[in-house]
């Protein structure tokens, strides 16, 4: 049986922290930033943790395979 391969798209979008949580980037922070106010663009450049437990289990399976 061959080794399981990790999902390369998920590996580029999500990172696992040392405690096992999943870190992700926020959407809408890459272009059309002149329309968005400064407070919003600062918030969009911060990374955040994934809070959906069912998605977290799926993503862990994809990136830690």
Swiss-Prot record:
GO terms for biological process: translation. Residues 28-53 are annotated as: Disordered. Residues 36-45 have a biased composition (Basic residues). GO terms for cellular component: cytosolic large ribosomal subunit. GO terms for molecular function: structural constituent of ribosome. Keywords: Ribonucleoprotein, Ribosomal protein. It comes from the Bacteria. Pfam families: Ribosomal_L35p. Belongs to the bacterial ribosomal protein bL35 family. PANTHER family: 54S RIBOSOMAL PROTEIN BL35M, LARGE RIBOSOMAL SUBUNIT PROTEIN BL35M. This is Large ribosomal subunit protein bL35. The lineage of its organism: Bacteria, Pseudomonadati, Chlorobiota, Chlorobiia, Chlorobiales. The gene is rpmI.
